[in-house]
Amino acid sequence: MAETSEGAGSGEPATVGGGGHGGQRSPIVWQGLSALLLLAVGGIHLYLALNGVGGVLGLLFVLNAVGALVLAIAIVALRRRPLLVASVLSLLFMVGTLLALVLALTIGLFGIRETLDFQLVPTALVVESIGTIVLVVTTAMVFRLRRGV
């Protein structure tokens, strides 16, 4: 039999260690991971914009970094329904960023062809792929908590 402790201010029992139904730590951990991965993606794009990627693409990379920062803050700061909205938007943002890179690597995007040997492309592929998976889990957890499942 697992020991339980009272969830902080929730009035519901929480499993020790936060795993299991009713635990409050698990969604917070996933929200934190989501925020870190959003910041990593934004950081990669900002680095590229400041170190050689110029023109319209450089401006889009700066906007990507700003969007990632805003979404990372929203993921950790919001609760209830606004958190669900932020989580879904973050997932769409991450999927869109990954899709744009994959398109640039394959058929080209807006006349830009990318190669795997370009600066940080393999890193971006890994971070964006992991970020997509983490955000799917985060969004599912937030949705389940919202429904009370």
Residue map of PLM features:
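Membrane-interface extramembranous regions
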Residues: 2-149
